[in-house]
């Protein structure tokens, strides 16, 4: 639900009315289907943990059915402490691009681990995964395979999300575009960039 400052992976613009959020949660959960929030912004600071919009989403959906995907240890710790009913998924944004790193992550307290998608077609490595039943494969990535800047892309997208949310606080009726990014937030050249902002 935009504008979630905790969002990562792809910049989400727009806004959602709190009543709409509540209706979506009740409708989807009413069918026994969990929602999984993609709170994977790697650039979060402690000041972002108290974000009213994101905490409201977490409170509205705090019923033991829903899930959250995380990359930030800071946010993960905050969610585990304040919203212990949520199942937590480890994000592909962590760039766990070896089987050893993936297996280590699977030993931690995660419901699922989303694999780095550079592993998706490396079948000889996939056979070495210890807990395949707790792995998830991402099939709609924004980056090209083996993108050398993927970690930086995630950071830049996280900064864009923060900039967007801060912009909305100052100018709630203003239109946010690439042209009015705050100073210090740079866009990068990437064939997939248009699909992220």
How does the language model describe each region?
Residues 1-101, 110-197:
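Active-site pocket-lining/capping segments in soluble small-molecule metabolic enzymes
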């Amino acid at each position: 639900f935009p504008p979630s400052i905790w969002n990562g992976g792809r910049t989400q613009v727009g806004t959602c009315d709190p009543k709409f959020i509540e209706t979506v949660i009740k409708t989807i959960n009413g069918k026994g289907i969990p929602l999984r929030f993609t709170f994977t912004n790697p650039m979060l600071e402690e000041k972002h943990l108290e974000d009213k919009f994101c905490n409201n989403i977490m409170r509205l959906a705090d019923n033991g059915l829903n899930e959250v995907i995380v990359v930030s240890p800071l946010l993960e710790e905050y969610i585990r402490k304040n919203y212990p009913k949520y199942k937590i998924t480890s994000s592909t944004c962590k760039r766990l691009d070896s089987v050893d790193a993936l297996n280590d992550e699977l030993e931690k307290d995660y419901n699922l681990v989303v694999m780095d998608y550079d592993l998706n077609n490396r079948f000889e490595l996939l056979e070495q995964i210890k807990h395949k039943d707790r792995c998830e494969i991402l099939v709609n990535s924004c980056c090209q395979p083996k993108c050398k800047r993927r970690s930086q892309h995630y950071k830049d997208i996280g900064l864009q999300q923060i900039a967007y949310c801060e912009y909305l606080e100052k100018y709630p009726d203003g239109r946010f575009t690439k042209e009015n990014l705050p100073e210090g937030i740079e866009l990068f050249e990437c064939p997939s960039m248009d699909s992220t902002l």
